[in-house]
Regions:
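Extended alpha-helical "rod" scaffolds
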Residues: 1-297
Length: 297
């Protein structure tokens, strides 16, 4: 497995196809083994003159039963290890896509994204996951195994999104773009992976994304109308604006019901620190979150 720098999809399709074919071959072998066992071993008493009770063919000490079970377990182990390796490689591919395609302007643009479309990076990540998961779902006959596989994909994808978010600076317009991307990830998890029970991960992250969009547009417009000579009034307006934003953010950070236990207060605080105006609002957020403005009388 190697990453193709020109086409991110091609480098993963070939090994994935080979593994899918191996899964199908292993299923066929197990089915043939089961048919042979049922027709030849279980009915052996009908083919020989010695009376052999059917009970002995199901005896857990029977060497045939032991060998058959061991073979089935070994095949299951190989499939599980292969799936784990496949997930690891897909996640490596997604990390590469983030490095190659995630622009700093995606979440910190100069202008707002009016078309509400996902970023190119988000589109490519979802595309490669669709290819991978569709091929695996066609290869795995066991629904329980497929559900565990999709759950692992969902959880690892969530961790990669978090890791990527912590590398970016986000402004108000970029916060809206981030929410658009997160909604597309959520749609993929719900519709393609059928992991509705894990949608809470992405809904919680969307609520975190809303913290990046908190802004006071009215205050900003008033500040621009102030005469350039009145610098003190301008600074006061800016101070009050940052104070109001900081208090609003602190209030939402402390509201644990928004994050459904997915994020702790400190984790939300850490994510919010990626705001572009963080150092302007940090003192007010600290006062609201940690009670640094409280005093003992």
């Amino acid at each position: 497995y190697t990453i193709d720098t020109e086409n991110e999809n091609d480098s993963i399709i070939k090994p994935l196809m080979n593994f899918s074919e191996l899964i199908n071959v292993s299923d066929i072998i197990l089915q043939l083994l089961q048919i042979f066992y049922k027709n030849e071993i279980e009915n052996i008493n009908k083919k020989i003159n010695m009376p052999i009770t059917k009970k002995k063919t199901y005896d857990f000490l029977n060497q045939l039963i032991i060998l058959k079970k061991n073979f089935e377990l070994k095949v299951d182990d190989f499939v599980a290890n292969g799936l784990n390796a496949g997930i690891t490689k897909v996640m490596e591919q997604i990390e590469y896509i983030y490095v190659l395609n995630q622009s700093p302007k995606d979440y910190c643009p100069d202008e707002s994204n009016l078309d509400k479309k996902p970023s190119i990076c988000c589109f490519k990540v979802i595309n490669i996951l669709k290819i991978h998961c569709q091929m695996i779902s066609k290869s795995l006959a066991n629904k329980a195994t497929l559900e565990i596989y999709n759950q692992e994909i969902t959880e690892r994808l969530f961790q990669l999104i978090l890791k990527n978010l912590k590398k970016n600076i986000v402004n108000v317009e970029g916060g809206n773009n981030l929410i658009n991307d997160l909604k597309h990830y959520l749609h993929f998890v719900e519709k393609e992976l059928k992991m509705k029970k894990l949608k809470i991960l992405f809904t919680s992250l969307i609520n975190v994304g809303l913290l990046y969009t908190i802004n006071l547009n009215e205050e900003e417009s008033e500040e621009q109308n102030i005469d350039s000579g009145d610098e003190k009034l301008r600074e006061k307006k800016k101070f009050n604006r940052n104070k109001a934003i900081g208090k609003d953010i602190a209030k939402k950070i402390c509201d644990s019901s928004l994050y459904h236990g997915v994020f702790t207060q400190d984790e939300v605080y850490d994510l919010v620190s990626r705001r572009i105006d963080w150092y302007n609002i940090k003192p007010f957020v600290d006062k609201g979150v940690y009670g640094l403005d409280c005093c003992i009388i």
